[in-house]
């Protein structure tokens, strides 16, 4: 998962380098400098915010990578300001966090990428309490049909065609293994 995060981050950096190169080639060095300053500040702030709130390195790396991947596709991915996760979280293993959040976020990215909506956003919330853990991924995608929601976590169920439909079944397996609960709320055309 860290490799995926680095791949997405590298891809985003290359896009930004192309903008800088283009500005220099058209004789706009001042605009290139301003773009560099703005881009690095924005990226630094986003990474810093995630690292401050999410102390578990694998989860923080996943969120940084998914944020970059979403941005490449014109999707805004934000971490709720109230989110927090300690480095020594006892609720799930780092791999379990990455499996659950990675699959939920990736499904949201794929749904939004296929959507014609203008406002494409994903909000991730991680709330770790003394007696509970809440992981929530919300998106402004097309929504999930009621008939599909009932079998969403069954292996092989997918709106994306044959050979798909394993991610959410794995999420269900992890949630069940940790004796948790999973719930889907969706409204057609809303997300």
Across the structure, where does each feature detected by a protein language model lie?
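Short alpha-helical Gxxx[C/S/T] motif in the catalytic ATP-binding
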Residues: 167, 171
């Amino acid at each position: 998962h860290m490799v995926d995060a680095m791949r997405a981050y590298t891809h985003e950096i290359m896009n930004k380098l192309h903008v800088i190169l283009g500005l220099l080639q058209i004789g706009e060095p001042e605009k290139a400098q301003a773009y560099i300053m703005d881009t690095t500040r924005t990226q630094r702030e986003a990474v810093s915010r995630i690292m401050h709130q999410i102390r578990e390195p694998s989860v923080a790396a996943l969120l940084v990578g998914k944020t970059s991947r979403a941005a490449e596709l014109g999707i805004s991915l934000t971490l709720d300001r109230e989110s927090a996760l300690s480095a020594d979280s006892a609720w799930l293993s780092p791999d379990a966090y990455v499996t659950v959040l990675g699959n939920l976020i990736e499904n949201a990215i794929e749904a939004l990428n296929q959507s014609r909506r203008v406002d494409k956003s994903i909000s991730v919330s991680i709330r770790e309490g003394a007696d509970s853990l809440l992981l929530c991924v919300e998106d402004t995608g097309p929504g999930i049909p009621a008939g599909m929601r009932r079998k969403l976590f069954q292996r092989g169920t997918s709106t994306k065609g044959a050979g798909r439909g394993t991610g959410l079944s794995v999420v269900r397996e992890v949630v069940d293994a940790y004796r948790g609960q999973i719930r889907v709320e969706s409204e057609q055309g809303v997300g």
